[in-house]
Amino acid sequence: MTVKSPDIQSLVEGLGHARVALAGDVMLDRFVYGHVERISPEAPIPVLRVDEERAMPGGAGNVARNLAALGAEVTFLSAVGDDEAGADLKAALEREGGIEAALTVVPGRTTTQKTRFVAMSQQILRADRETTQPLDAASAERLLAALTSALKDRQVLVLSDYGKGVLTPAFARGAIAAARAAGIPVIVDPKGRDYSLYAGASVVTPNRKELGEATGAAVDTDEEIVAAARALMKAHDIGAVVVTRAQAGMSVITADGAVTHLKAEAREVFDVSGAGDTVVSTLAAALGTGLTLAEAAGLANSAAGIVVGKVGTAVVHQDELLAKLRERELSMLEAKVAGLKSAEDIVAGWRARGLTVGFTNGCFDLLHPGHVTLLERSRALCDRLVVGLNSDASVSRLKGPERPVQPDIARATVLAALASVDLVVIFEEDTPEALIKALRPDILVKGGDYTIDKIVGADFVQAHGGRVEIVDIVPGFSTTGTLARLKG
């Protein structure tokens, strides 16, 4: 997803307006942190000297935490046992803030706990206490009634299935039916092989392994993943599949045939605990505020890249996501400024996809409305617009020794920030003729009162089947005039 400032801040802050209903398997995540200095004399195992212990809501509880961290309003429904872990979970959720938790207490049920022992940022052991028994019918009915009531003022429903028995077949199907009746999209983080439980869901978010298990198909390549996802959608009336692929990123496949592959954005991976929770929560908040699935997946991919760089069952806050998106935008701006060889490769790729390539050029020293209008009108004539930019030496030869005011890298960065510009190439010559011959644009655009025979490169473009367009410029704006007024 491409987001331009200042839209980034309003987009991220907009996640705080999402109203989400969440149901699923809650569990207590305990982390025992320490260090290892020796091997036990009793057995060939490390001895962990404990320094710190932490406990926090996990499973669907971590989805709730992530939603709250993004600023969303969350109604969370689940079931716990009448045990110490259940009481600890209720207290932990109350401390979180922003989560309206409705936990059904089921006598005799074991609350799931996962205890991870960690030394030097590495897990050395995990110990589980859990039940996978389906919730009894009476408790499931109470939970479904509470969820149906909660949907009245929610924008999206999330079902977080960890296979611990809360999402019984009857509950899952009833929840999806209630949401569809209310016109609310349903996102499912699935578990197991039987996706008939999720029939009618808007989006399911399996990881690559889960997708393979659910379909019995190979899922090693992009093509195999797309084929498996399409089979899943067709079999169970699912609207879209978002496949999380660890270091390979994410794939988004929709029932209307659209496919998007997103590269992973993590720089360092310390712990993947709960990364899927971050993905589903970001998707939910984004869809709840009206973003498209492709846009929501882009945000979720960025959020996942943040959370795997943390230790433990972690969350992503609004300010972290905002910083990540701004960092990515700067990287994208840099990527839009290319040398000649890179530009040739990029243009060849566009042309292979059947895209029309346009070209215009100039000094663009102090960007003004005339420049902006020229670029917008040029971009309207093509699918991709390349801007040839005179280098500092070239500008000095053309405009005089006091020009340019801004160096070429600064001018290129400003141009790259415009949505109308797809690529900027700096050239050293006085004219862009060599650049035009190298890139062979389909459309050559010039602003002003030129005639075609006076436009550099026009004959070459026309000889190769292209066309030349002259667009009107906005009168009253020029860099030279602006500088003259400043000198007064």
UniProtKB/Swiss-Prot annotation:
GO terms for biological process: ADP-L-glycero-beta-D-manno-heptose biosynthetic process. InterPro entries: Bifunc_HldE, Carboh/pur_kinase_PfkB_CS, Cyt_trans-like, PfkB_dom, RfaE_dom_I, RfaE_dom_II, Ribokinase-like, Rossmann-like_a/b/a_fold. Keywords: ATP-binding, Carbohydrate metabolism, Kinase, Multifunctional enzyme, Nucleotide-binding, Nucleotidyltransferase, Transferase. One of its GO terms (molecular function) is ATP binding. ATP binds at N207, R208, K209, E210. The keyword DNA repair does not apply. The keyword Transferase applies. Residues 359-488 are annotated as: Cytidylyltransferase. Pathway: Nucleotide-sugar biosynthesis; ADP-L-glycero-beta-D-manno-heptose biosynthesis; ADP-L-glycero-beta-D-manno-heptose from D-glycero-beta-D-manno-heptose 7-phosphate: step 1/4; Nucleotide-sugar biosynthesis; ADP-L-glycero-beta-D-manno-heptose biosynthesis; ADP-L-glycero-beta-D-manno-heptose from D-glycero-beta-D-manno-heptose 7-phosphate: step 3/4. It catalyses: D-glycero-beta-D-manno-heptose 7-phosphate + ATP = D-glycero-beta-D-manno-heptose 1,7-bisphosphate + ADP + H(+); D-glycero-beta-D-manno-heptose 1-phosphate + ATP + H(+) = ADP-D-glycero-beta-D-manno-heptose + diphosphate. Its EC number is 2.7.1.167, 2.7.7.70. One of its GO terms (cellular component) is cytosol. It comes from the Bacteria. Residues 1-332 are annotated as: Ribokinase. HAMAP family: HldE (MF_01603). Homodimer. In the N-terminal section; belongs to the carbohydrate kinase PfkB family. In the C-terminal section; belongs to the cytidylyltransferase family. This is Bifunctional protein HldE. The lineage of its organism: Bacteria, Pseudomonadati, Pseudomonadota, Alphaproteobacteria, Hyphomicrobiales. The gene is hldE.
